[in-house]
Design a protein with these regions (language model features):
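A post-motif C-terminal structural segment
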Residues: 1-22, 68-275
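Surface-exposed loop and membrane-interface regions of Gram-negative outer-membrane beta-barrel proteins
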Residues: 13-20, 30-39
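Mobile, glycine-rich extracellular loop/lid and propeptide segments
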Residues: 24-25, 29-30, 38, 44-45, ...
């Protein structure tokens, strides 16, 4: 099945990730910058909240900080996507049982090297109330029958920072995080849950488009493609799983055309960005 998505927000022709993710998570369009609120700042019930009432378990996965707009729209209600102090608290207190990505700095106060302006050491609160994961190896060592809420913060900011390659070996790929979330969700089903929902965001595809960086873009598309393949493999095996692959907006105006315009049969192509 294929379809067309109209990505405009409530108050602009060009959307941002907050309003577009809110449209996906709630079924309602809203103003740019808003998360889980309508155009009048009234709280909208999101998908993870709705299905929790019916006995389903949810997971959120992102290669950005978990407080970034797309994952936040599925677990937070704030009027501006930049209010990360509020977003991180919302996500910690949400009913989403598995949240994986980057963003440790948004759980620590500025005096401890973090980015929280409220002075709260939320990382310590996560440790005391839930299970905190900080390295990729902890995914494979996790006991799946542990029913704690799991928050994985595998980097101070986003995952696999192109300027910090030495950290990459400690940070999971999208497909590794998805495998963990699927296996954990299946364990929850064994323990009585009716089913599960997993949102996976290839966050940095957008950033590579902003940077007009084709090598960065190819790396992120490869990472996302592997996660999609994992999802499809599981769906074929399970026979009762819906996989939706979509985007909230385009970035960069990427053009792919024949390297030799006069020869449309040539295998070589060239890439260019238009915005």
């Amino acid at each position: 099945i294929s379809g067309i998505v109209l990505t405009h927000s409530e108050n602009a022709i060009v959307t941002d990730s907050a309003s577009s993710a809110t449209a996906y998570s709630t079924g309602r369009k809203t103003n740019n910058g808003a998360l889980g609120l309508d155009k009048d700042n009234k709280i909208l019930e999101n998908l993870t909240e709705r299905i929790h009432e019916y006995g389903y378990v949810s997971s959120l996965i992102s290669t950005s900080e978990i407080t970034h707009a797309t994952p936040a729209a599925f677990a937070s209600h704030v009027d501006l996507r930049w209010k990360t102090d509020e977003i991180s608290k919302d996500m910690m207190e949400s009913n989403v049982m598995t949240i994986l990505g980057g963003g440790r700095h948004f759980f620590l106060p500025e005096e401890m090297g973090g980015k929280r302006e409220d002075g709260l050491d939320l990382l310590q609160e996560v440790k005391s109330k839930h299970t905190l994961l900080t390295q990729k190896r902890e995914l494979s060592g996790f006991a799946l029958d542990n029913r704690d809420k799991v928050i994985g913060l595998f980097a101070d900011e986003h995952l696999r920072d192109i300027e910090k390659p030495d950290n990459h070996s400690f940070e999971p790929t999208s497909s590794e995080m998805l495998d963990f979330a699927i296996n954990r969700s299946l364990k929850f089903q064994e323990m009585g849950c009716k089913g599960f929902f997993i949102m996976v965001e290839g966050s940095q595809v957008d950033w590579a488009g902003h940077a007009n960086n084709i090598n960065y873009l190819k790396r992120e598309m490869q990472d996302f493609d592997e996660a999609v393949q994992n999802a499809l493999d599981y769906a074929i095996q399970s026979q009762d799983t819906l996989v939706i692959v979509t985007a909230d907006h385009e970035t960069g105006g990427l053009l792919i055309e024949p390297a030799a315009p006069a020869d449309y049969t040539a295998p070589e192509v060239k890439f260019s960005f238009n915005t």
